[in-house]
A protein has these predicted regions:
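Short helix-loop capping/hinge motifs at secondary-structure junctions, enriched
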Residues: 160-163
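S-adenosyl-L-methionine-dependent nucleic acid methyltransferase catalytic domains
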Residues: 1-134, 143, 147, 156, ...
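Short hydrophobic/aromatic beta-strand element in the GNAT-like acyltransferase core
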Residues: 152
């Protein structure tokens, strides 16, 4: 595949077109299957949309390319899909490559569902768990503390990585306090500070290749451009490919 492009392609299909050990860094956040966990992949009806919060979330999922199914799979199918994606990421990562996988603990039936359920079934090693403190949440529960955090799982093929936390003289903890990004016609954009923080830990005189297989509005790719690295983005929906290309064009023309 040609570098420094956003491809309108399904994440798994795009990954399968990449050569073995061809990517230095993967930074991504897949759909969370929030509705699939709740509805077990059943078609959504008015009976499923009992709360205003669920209705808002449903509308956001419809906005995600107009395809509700992207966030409404049977949970076992979703987990199998994530395992397949992650194992393809393992294949395309270089031996000292790293993947940063943003996900969250989800609630179902009063119990927390952790991404570790499927992470430990992949070929990747969990090198470190980073807590992303977003500082605010639209979700308020009378029986729980406010859920203001998500997780960024640093996944590797082994112990060796390109990480160098000392080169820039800035040593960070594993808790990152970074506010949510302002929406940019995508329902769940990455804050660029989050991706910048990751890439700052991988200073290199080489042109590293950075991949985002769920690139959305391409914040990962823009951060890679800032660092002088090459990028690849996969996005299933053409409207977000167009949004990405527009954002990249505006950024590079500054």
């Amino acid at each position: 595949m040609e570098l420094n492009k956003i491809y309108c392609i399904d994440a798994l299909e795009g990954l399968k077109q990449l050569e073995d050990e061809s990517v230095d860094l993967i930074i991504t956040s897949p759909p969370y299957n929030k509705h699939g966990l709740r509805n077990n992949g059943r078609p959504v009806t008015n009976n499923n949309l009992k709360s205003a919060a669920v209705q808002r979330s449903w509308v956001q999922s419809i906005a995600y390319g107009g395809d509700y199914n992207v966030d409404n799979m049977k949970e076992e199918d979703y987990e199998r899909w994530q395992i397949e994606i992650l194992n393809e990421c393992y294949r395309v990562l270089k031996k000292d490559g790293s993947m940063f996988y943003n996900h969250k603990n989800r609630l179902y039936g009063g119990e927390v569902y952790s991404p570790y359920k499927w992470l430990y079934k992949t070929k990747l090693m969990v090198h470190q768990e980073i807590v992303w403190d977003m500082g605010a949440t639209p979700i308020v529960s009378p029986i729980r503390w406010l859920p203001t955090t998500e997780r960024i799982y640093w996944l590797t093929k082994g112990k060796q990585t390109k990480f160098n936390r000392n080169k820039n003289g800035d040593i960070k903890s594993e808790v990152w306090r970074i506010n949510r990004a302002t929406r940019n016609n995508h329902p769940a954009p990455f804050p660029i500070k989050l991706v910048d923080t990751i890439l700052d830990g991988f200073p290199s005189d080489e042109k590293l290749i950075v991949l985002d297989p769920f690139c959305g509005s391409s914040t990962t790719c823009i951060s890679a451009i800032k660092k002088g690295y090459d990028y690849l983005g996969f996005e299933k929906f053409q409207e977000y490919v167009d949004l990405s290309n527009d954002r990249i064009k505006k950024f590079t023309e500054k």
